[in-house]
């Protein structure tokens, strides 16, 4: 089941809500998700494999943007069900591009209208859903609020009805196929995105240099790459306060995910123009499509 949509419609929040635990990072900033991320939900006789995808966007100014779009579009292939996520039914330019790809897909389709809790006048909800149903007459519509866990049972029921029968691919306890190294790098990036202004988060990437278990703790060394010296200064903050705060917040989340004490060391380095350098982004782990 691929979850697709433009940036910032709540795809990662929806995945986390459906799984009942957080595996995909979130922030209020668009393009937080950079990789396809598999989430596995097993309940009784059902196992659903969800794929959270980067937001599809028309503007591709850098190699990183092209990678993200390529990742998202690759998820449209070989899936049984496609969830097209819309923010309160609004369809803008980027949504039109997703709609075009959605219509071309041979998968079973569901339109998920998210953030219904933010609709102030609830009387507008039914007319909006009716207009969408006219535009997509053969597609099932499900209004939800991923943030408030509203109507997710109905969405899961619709998904299960659309999925074919097949054996389980993963153990019932498994929630993702991503490594712990990947998950901890994403946790650091989430904390940075939440701490920093609008532009800087997009110039940041994380590389885990060391991931060792010893003395009843996991020891992690992480390098945070930025593109300019000025960005490095902003990220570190006055007397290192911002970086220290990011490290503390990240460590708490890591301990929750890993279930052990974490010793985290972080460094900030400049890698000029990495986000528009195909070779650099591959070396930094953006090479899975």
Which residue stretches match the model-derived regions?
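Conserved, well-folded catalytic cores of nucleic-acid-processing
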Residues: 21, 40, 44, 56, ...
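Solvent-exposed alpha-helical segments within well-ordered globular domains of core cellular machineries
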Residues: 16, 35, 39, 66, ...
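Conserved G1/Walker A P-loop phosphate-binding module
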Residues: 1-81, 223-225
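Catalytic P-loop NTPase motifs of RecA-like helicase/translocase cores
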Residues: 33, 57-58, 91-92, 119-120, ...
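Canonical P-loop GTPase G-domain recognition
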Residues: 108-110, 117-180
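P-loop NTP-binding site
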Residues: 180-289
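Conserved glycine(s) of the Walker
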Residues: 10, 151, 242
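Conserved C-terminal guanine-recognition region of P-loop GTPase G domains, centered on the G4
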Residues: 41-47, 67-141, 212-217
């Amino acid at each position: 089941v691929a979850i697709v949509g433009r940036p910032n419609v709540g795809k990662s929040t929806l995945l986390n809500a459906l799984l009942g635990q957080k595996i995909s990072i979130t922030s209020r900033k668009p393009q937080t998700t950079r990789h396809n991320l598999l989430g596995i939900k097993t309940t009784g006789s059902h196992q659903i494999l969800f794929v959270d995808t980067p937001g599809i966007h028309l503007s591709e100014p850098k190699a990183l943007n092209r990678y993200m779009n390529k990742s998202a579009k690759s998820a449209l292939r070989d899936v049984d069900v496609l969830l097209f996520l819309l923010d309160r039914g609004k369809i803008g330019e980027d949504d039109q591009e997703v709609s075009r790809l959605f219509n071309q897909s041979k998968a079973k389709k569901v339109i998920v209208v998210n953030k219904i809790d933010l609709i102030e006048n609830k009387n507008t909800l039914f007319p909006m859903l009716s207009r969408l149903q006219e535009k997509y007459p053969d597609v099932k519509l499900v209004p939800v609020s991923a943030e408030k866990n509203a109507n997710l049972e109905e969405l899961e029921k619709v998904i299960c009805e659309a999925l074919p029968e097949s054996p389980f691919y993963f153990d019932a306890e498994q929630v993702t196929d991503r490594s712990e190294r990947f998950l901890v790098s994403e946790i650091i990036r989430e904390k940075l995105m939440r701490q920093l202004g609008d532009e800087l988060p997009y110039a940041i990437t994380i590389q885990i240099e060391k991931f060792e278990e010893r003395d009843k703790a996991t020891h992690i060394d992480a390098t945070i790459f930025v593109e300019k010296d000025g960005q490095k200064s902003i990220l570190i903050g006055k007397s290192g306060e911002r970086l220290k705060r990011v490290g503390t917040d990240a460590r708490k989340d890591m301990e929750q995910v890993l279930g052990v004490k974490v010793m985290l060391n972080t460094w900030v380095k400049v890698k000029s123009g990495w986000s528009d350098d195909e070779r650099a982004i591959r070396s930094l782990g953006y090479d899975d499509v």
